[in-house]
Amino acid sequence: MDRVKRVIHCDRAYKMGLNGKNITVAVMDTGIAPHLDFDQRILHFEDFCQKKLAAYDDNGHGTHVAGIIGGSGLMSKDKRGVQLLSGVAPRVRFVVLKVL
């Protein structure tokens, strides 16, 4: 992720205060697993496959995609407390539609 963020110049956006705050992204994929890196930013989950009510991901792909987009990096801290990884827009909110 760090390499990708360098290639697409995320540092420029971050310096301008652009980090996903007040932005909502729809992820249409295999779902999303509740995770501390999404720290209550999943606004809505809709399951079009099995009609379950609670957020889940029975494949992992949707959670991976959501992490790339907006994982906070909270769970990637090293022993010193230094955050190692985060998504491109770590403050974004999610609407997740399980379609696969």
How would you label these PLM feature ranges?
Residues 2-6, 28, 70:
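Functionally constrained cores in energy, signaling, and assembly domains
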Residues 14-25, 32-44, 52-100:
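Subtilisin-like serine protease catalytic core
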Residues 1-15:
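Autoinhibitory propeptides
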